[in-house]
């Protein structure tokens, strides 16, 4: 390529999370994917790169065939280079190698079958890079991959001097790596067209190629972008300006690889894009990073110095959010089970279906949290959890996993043992270190984790909520990096945080007063809170059921034996409360269930209490003996019963999180609190019983 010319590798990455609402995909197609491809089709001279995740391609082929056929036509005439990747957009670095291969091969095979091409390059989900990837990707047939120029900056290179592609390796197996320009990521499509061309002109004669591939949703889905990009003509002007620039070659990545030598070798550290590194940090570290950036700016440090403030590591999300860690480790356990079962019975269709369900459960969106909602969005968590439960159910149906069965092991990497129980109807996790709490209550009859309630935690952006942050009045289209606005007033009142992780069979001893306990947050008033106490634990199989008994050694204020029995679709708990030998006691014993169905305030989601209140309501009843949480939409009833009769209270668990649309409240689940008055003579024992049964409607 002549020195006075510059190749510009422009492209888009289109993705919708597994489990996203159908109307969201329809809107994204109509507002971004289809109009972008239509304008591209009208200008045959424009050549660029497109990556669509496999699940989105499947949806387009079935639900928007015109858009799918348009993409196929563009690829067929060589105008678009399609990239492979993990079919369900997983974070490849954290998957077992056999799943890395399987995910890539599935998307590559789809493109071969339905488009007629074999992709050479790959899109790396969230650009999460780890140094072991070159060998695995190359062995999967990948010739080149894209990451951010941020990765290169962390290796000590100047982002403003980057161009072309670079060579890296692992164990001698090489891979080409293209740096994505952050400068162009922030300019396109938000700034005027000329700003991007001016920047490209500064790179002319210095590097052979510059690359900018970013989210296709920027071109019509993000707030304000549809009008800006299409109705006001930004994309037409951009394409016209690119074609009118004589020194600019519109190239695909394969064009550059075939025509240009590698720029240099490079070894990249663990990294993702800049924002991801910031989001992954624990809260205190996020605040320190913010101060460091401000201090550097005040001292006159430029972007080059700021590039070395690296932020965190993607895997830190697995520590930051224990619920995410549990999902990740469950995925790993199931991956091993699927692989072993397929090795024994490679032609069993049930196992093939289990493998596909496993891969769906590896979709990245519910495993982290940033400006796009992530793990705070229950429908995304539910989709991933449901896929993993489907995988587990199919393994059970094939006979690859026995039932009833239990194991006791450190199954989530936290150094403490959990008890994992499986029947033909349920799969659940009990935590001796959390007072015997249930943190997974998977109902295999509907592939639904009824216990999937995310705890309320402080996030760095909550300070903006308290300050009443609003979008400023500057003209122009805002990027996701601008301060978001609240979607409703009064969100600051919801900024309460949980001292203990959300779960079920959270229990404790309270005073004998008459002041009602808060069903959502009772624990600060507890005289004894079992979720804060590790308990002794024994487990055994008993006549087709699994019995797990937790004991507390201390006698004050009461000694506790908590016997949990799991049989088919029912979990029963029996409490034996004993007063100290020489001291009578009086108080209240309470047990909390945190349960997640599909919505808090939607038709067909309610409690069977008086008046059938919604799952998102708050209420209280005295002398109740049971209640059911009903979700007619998904077809599940969670039936609670207890004896003797007790006070029942309930309320919604709501978080405040941020998405590209602004700050918003999100219903995570319903907290149900059952409270018994208990008076014991010295040395007396009393037994209380409660149960939950999950049923199909």
Describe the residue ranges of each PLM region.
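Active-site and substrate-binding clefts of carbohydrate-active enzymes
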Residues: 2-34, 41-43, 162-167, 171-175, ...
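Short, well-structured secondary-structure segments
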Residues: 5-103, 118-124, 143-149, 252
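Acidic-aromatic substrate-binding/catalytic surfaces of carbohydrate-active enzymes
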Residues: 27-30, 98, 102, 424-536
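CE4/NodB-like, metal-dependent polysaccharide N-deacetylase domain
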Residues: 99-126, 201-214
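Beta-strand-rich recognition/accessory modules
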Residues: 403, 410, 526-561, 567-574, ...
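Short, well-ordered beta-strand segments enriched in hydrophobic/aromatic residues
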Residues: 421, 425, 571-579, 683
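Acidic (Asp/Glu-rich), glycine- and aromatic
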Residues: 433-447, 452-459, 553-560, 566-610, ...
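Active-site/ligand-binding surface loops and adjacent short beta/alpha elements
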Residues: 584-588, 594-652, 659, 669
